[in-house]
Every structure is written in C-alpha cells, then in structure tokens.
Amino acid sequence: MSEELWVEKYRPRSLDEIVDQEEIVKRLKEFVKNKNMPHLLFAGPPGTGKTTAALALAHDLYGESWRDNTLELNASDERGIDVIRSRIKDYARTLPIGDVPFKLVILDEADNMTGDAQQALRRTMELFSRNTRFILIANYASKIIEPIQSRCAVFRFQPLPKGDAFQRLRWIAQQEGITVDDGALEAIWEESQGDLRKAINTLQAASAISRNVTEEVVYAALGRVKPKEVREMIESALKGNLLEARDKLRLLLYNYGLSGVDIIRFIHREVLSQKSVRLDDATLAELLVLVGETNYRIVEGSDDEIQLMALLSKLALVSKKAAKG
C-alpha cells in the first residue's frame, strides 16, 4: 500500500475531475475560458472541495506554470498583519508568467484571520487588483469582514451527497486494490458527516488494518464505539430502564474512553435521526434543548457522568410524557 495520503493522491487536478458542485464548476470553467475572474470567496463546511476547486482552477488557468503563478497560504498558521504586508505584497508586486493577465493568491482558512489582518488584506486586494486575484477559503463566510465579501464573488459549497461520496470511495478502493462493503461505507459516512476528506482518510486508516474493509474494521481504525451501542443506551433510557442505561453509559465512558462531549454528539445525532424512537415535533424540540443544556454544562466543567445520567433521566421523563400524550 502506498504511504502517500489518499486525499492528495486522488485529489482532482482539473475542474473536469471534481465530483458534484456542478454549478460552481460551470462558473469556474467560464473564468478559465475567458482568462478573467473577480476575487473569489469559497465558503462551506470542511471536506466539501473548496481547496480542491481553487487548486484545480489554478491548474486549468496556468497549465504547467500554475505553481509559478499561485501563492498558497494557510491563514491558521500565518494570521498576522506582517504576512499580509510582506509575503502577499511582495508576491502581488510581480507580474504573472504566461498569457493569463493575473496571478493567484489562495488563502485557506481565511476566516481564522484577525480583524486587523483582514483589513490589511482588503487594502492589499485593492492595491494589486490589476495583476492579482485572491481566492479566500473559509468554513464560515460570516467571519469574513463585509468590505472583503463585497469585493468577492461568493461560492457556497455543499456537502457531497451520500451516493456520490460512496461512489468516490468505491472508486478509490478499486484503485488501491481493496474491498469495502456497504456496512463500512455507512460507518464511514456516519463518522465523516459529509466531509469527503475525512471519509477518505478514514478509508485509508481502515485499509491499513485489513484489505477487506468492513464496518468492524472501520470502527477499529477509528477507535470508536458503534452508533448502535449509543443507540441502545438511549433506547434503555426512553423505555425507563435507567439502571440499564447507566451501565451502558459507564461502558462508553470508562471502557471505551469516550468523553462526555463525544457522547453528547452521538446522542444529538441519534435524537435528530429518530432511529431510536419516533417523536413529534414538540417532544423532539424539548429533547434537543435538553441535549444543548447538558452539552453546555459539560463544556463548562461539570462532571460528565452526572450530567449525562441526568440527561438520560430527563429523556425517560419526556418519553413517558409523550407516550401519555
């Protein structure tokens, strides 16, 4: 098995290779065709292809000379004003190589930049707009100051649909000569929650354990419990079997080593999916408020077991009240 990270090995190199995001790809291809584009802001959840789209755009614009015409920076590592005033300015001052009349600056995780750094970036964008275009990549567009947003065409990336994600994972598995069954794909999807990068990393980690990737192998690679075990705890609470629910909770906390926050996330997901029990809207809303309050108390430093046991007790009461209805 290759030691290369699969997320890099199978990263699309051109816009034609990008899975999903059809409307975005269509508009980006127009920029390539016209060799002209505004500043861009790519926003959306992690693992939805924002960085991949930016690099593919650079490949398609500049061909073999894309590296000479593209500056990549990660704002999480280089957040200060000094970077904006030195590296970007020095790079933006030089002319592009080739027949495209501008160079690219790709600034990943731009929503992690300080307010002062964003103001400095805004001035730099204005000063060098004649021969430089900026692609800002952010999980949250709302964290980018309005003066920058107004200077950019905003593209909002959506998580890859489940079917497309499965197709991509099966294709990668085929390229690597491994097998992956449907249960494994479901487990990977459950863990990644639409983040394709995380899904591919999980598949690679599982393949290091076995060339035949199953659900069991995936959870072994993750070092996580199956959602089924959390679901059983919730079902016990909803049925009023609190001692049984407590035993299952302790198993998750002390045998599997899950944190209270991890378990809360599982519970939140299960309540929303309603796989454990069907709930009317009012009951669902009440349970979600309880989950949120418990999460807050745990994050603030309260005892995990006490808070989670209190939540399970409240789940039992809410379920009983709903049944009487």
Swiss-Prot record:
**One GO location term (cellular component):** DNA replication factor C complex
Q: Name one GO biological process term.
A: DNA-templated DNA replication
- Alphabetically list the UniProt keywords: ATP-binding, DNA replication, Nucleotide-binding
- Where does this protein hold ATP? 44-51
From the Swiss-Prot or TrEMBL record, what is one GO molecular function term? Answer: ATP binding
Q: Which Pfam families match?
A: AAA (PF00004), RCF1-5-like_lid (PF21960), Rep_fac_C (PF08542)
Q: Which SMART domains match?
A: AAA (SM00382)
InterPro entries in alphabetical order: AAA+_ATPase, ATPase_AAA_core, CbxX/CfxQ, DNA_pol3_clamp-load_cplx_C, DNA_Rep/Repair_Clamp_Loader, P-loop_NTPase, Rep_factor-C_ssu_arc, Rep_factorC_C
Q: Which cysteines are joined by disulfide bonds?
A: none
The record's note on quaternary structure and interaction partners says:
Heteromultimer composed of small subunits (RfcS) and large subunits (RfcL).
NCBIfam families in the cross-refs: PRK00440.1
* Family per similarity comment: Belongs to the activator 1 small subunits family. RfcS subfamily.
Described by its record, this protein's role is as follows: Part of the RFC clamp loader complex which loads the PCNA sliding clamp onto DNA.
Protein name, entry field: Replication factor C small subunit
| Organism of derivation | Thermofilum pendens (strain DSM 2475 / Hrk 5)
What is the name of the gene encoding this protein? rfcS
